[in-house]
């Protein structure tokens, strides 16, 4: 028996895609949404597995709100690269199944390992 928990955190940031030809090679911004899927195999005596509030607090400390992502990171901040980056960061503290980074309500990238 297991549960998959979902926690989301929004942040606003600017970026541009390096080595890309098209409109996204220019600086632009998004209200990103970081969606983290966590695995839990048991519940505590209160009926929960992982406290959503603690996860949200942790995610707020990770996201570079109102920053230029190209300056914040040493890689081209595509949705794909951001999803992989956040997967590894969150995995240091929580049992991550997958991470999705949404650039808009209908465009995003997911990253998972071992699948």
Show which residues each predicted segment covers.
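Charge-rich, low-complexity N-terminal segments
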Residues: 1-115
